[in-house]
């Protein structure tokens, strides 16, 4: 009887073992599925990290392949809007910074934005004082290595800008621009400022220049920081004359590099639009303008204890362009 009873309980025990095995299989399958899902999580995180890396790297790539336009303006809203519209179509332009020198007056930011959208962001920077050197601040919005600085009455063709930017990429430590000037030492040892109408400064054929004006030029954004570190007397001179910040920048660059401060690029189509505005006339119309420029050169020589500017006769022009069509009116 005892054996019979023992034998009768065997089927139940077998069923229990089967249930246990089934449960173990289910648990094992669940563990495998959970493990597989867990293994997928690092891939998701890795994808996110790759995306994040791309986002982090993209500004550096943009910094090399694009430039920021800085334009200082005063009493020329009509021209400003026209120029902003023109420069929106320039390739490689990353951002536009408008240095608004009409102190206490509201800029045309709302009007500009209301007529958008625009392909290139424009940032208006109202100033608390109308100073010439406002445009040489270290703007936190500048995210590119190259800065294009353009006066608010100057229209430069997209073709000229694309070409000049390509030259700057080859010579990123110099000013690459469209308007050359030079200094000349007189017999008395006093320096004069001028253009190609002055005597040739050295032996040999052809003419030379020693400065490239920054109002139509590309230069490295690091020079904005270096400008802030120049002697206080330099800043005071610019504020005193409301002039000569471009001459000071040429002194800075050539002192920093030991090379000529800039390279002259011959423009194909660059136009001064000052006659088309109802606003402010440029400083170069003032009778004392060139006298001030000569004054600044001599003052800077005293501040820096010497003349650092170097002459150059290099002019770069676009190969193969039909020069009969040149329209430069500068």
From Swiss-Prot:
Coiled-coil segments: none
Enzyme active site: 246
GO terms under biological process: N-acetylglucosamine metabolic process; UDP-N-acetylgalactosamine metabolic process
Positions in the Lumenal compartment: 43-330
Enzyme class, spelled out: transferase
Effect of residue 293 to A: Reduced activity
Membrane topology category: Single-pass type II membrane protein
Taxonomic superkingdom: Eukaryota
Sites carrying sugar chains: 75
Residue ranges that the UniProt entry lists as topological domain Cytoplasmic: 1-21
Ligand binding (UDP-N-acetyl-alpha-D-galactosamine): 72, 76, 101, 130, 135, 151-153, 245, 293
Catalytic activity: 3-O-(beta-D-GlcA-(1->3)-beta-D-Gal-(1->3)-beta-D-Gal-(1->4)-beta-D-Xyl)-L-seryl-[protein] + UDP-N-acetyl-alpha-D-glucosamine = 3-O-(alpha-D-GlcNAc-(1->4)-beta-D-GlcA-(1->3)-beta-D-Gal-(1->3)-beta-D-Gal-(1->4)-beta-D-Xyl)-L-seryl-[protein] + UDP + H(+)
Gene3D superfamilies per the UniProt record, alphabetical: Spore Coat Polysaccharide Biosynthesis Protein SpsA, Chain A
GO terms for MF: alpha-1,4-N-acetylgalactosaminyltransferase activity; glucuronyl-galactosyl-proteoglycan 4-alpha-N-acetylglucosaminyltransferase activity; glucuronylgalactosylproteoglycan 4-beta-N-acetylgalactosaminyltransferase activity; glycosaminoglycan binding; manganese ion binding
Subcellular location field: Endoplasmic reticulum membrane
Transmembrane residue ranges: 22-42
Cofactor: Mn(2+)
Residues involved in Mn(2+) binding: 153
Keyword field: Disulfide bond, Endoplasmic reticulum, Glycoprotein, Glycosyltransferase, Manganese, Membrane, Metal-binding, Signal-anchor, Transferase, Transmembrane, Transmembrane helix
Main location: endoplasmic reticulum
E.C. number: 2.4.1.223
Binding-site residues, UDP-N-acetyl-alpha-D-glucosamine: 72, 76, 101, 130, 135, 151-153, 245-246, 293
Family: Belongs to the glycosyltransferase 47 family.
Its job: Glycosyltransferase required for the biosynthesis of heparan-sulfate and responsible for the alternating addition of beta-1-4-linked glucuronic acid (GlcA) and alpha-1-4-linked N-acetylglucosamine (GlcNAc) units to nascent heparan sulfate chains.
Protein name: Exostosin-like 2
Gene: Extl2
């Amino acid at each position: 009887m005892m054996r019979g009873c023992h034998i009768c309980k065997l089927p139940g025990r077998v069923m229990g073992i089967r249930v246990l095995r089934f449960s173990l299989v289910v648990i094992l399958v669940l563990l495998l599925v959970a493990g597989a899902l867990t293994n997928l999580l690092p891939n998701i995180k890795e994808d996110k990290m790759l995306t994040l890396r791309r986002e982090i790297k993209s500004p550096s790539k943009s910094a090399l392949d694009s430039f920021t336009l800085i334009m200082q303006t005063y009493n020329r809203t009509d021209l400003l809007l026209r120029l902003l519209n023109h420069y929106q179509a320039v390739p490689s332009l990353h951002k536009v910074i408008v240095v608004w020198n009409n102190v206490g007056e509201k800029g045309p930011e709302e009007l500009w934005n209301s007529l958008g959208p625009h392909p290139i962001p424009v940032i208006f920077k109202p100033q608390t004082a109308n100073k010439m050197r406002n445009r040489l601040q270290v703007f936190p919005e500048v995210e590119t290595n190259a800065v294009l600085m353009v006066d608010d009455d100057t229209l430069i063709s997209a073709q000229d800008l694309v070409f000049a930017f390509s030259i700057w990429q080859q010579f990123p430590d110099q000013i690459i621009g469209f308007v050359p000037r030079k200094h000349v030492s007189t017999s008395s040892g006093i320096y004069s400022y001028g253009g190609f109408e002055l005597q040739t400064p050295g032996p040999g054929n052809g003419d030379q220049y020693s400065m490239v004006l920054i109002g139509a030029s590309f230069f490295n954004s690091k020079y904005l920081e270096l400008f802030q570190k120049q002697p206080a007397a330099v800043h005071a001179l610019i504020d005193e004359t409301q002039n000569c910040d471009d001459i000071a920048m040429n002194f800075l660059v050539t002192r920093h590099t030991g090379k000529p401060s800039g390279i002259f690029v011959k423009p194909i189509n660059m136009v001064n639009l000052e006659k088309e505005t109802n606003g402010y006339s440029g400083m170069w119309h003032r009778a004392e303008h060139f006298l001030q420029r000569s004054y600044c050169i001599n003052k800077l020589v005293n501040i820096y204890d010497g003349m650092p500017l170097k002459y150059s006769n290099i002019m770069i022009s676009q190969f193969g362009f039909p020069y009969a069509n040149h329209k430069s009116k500068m």
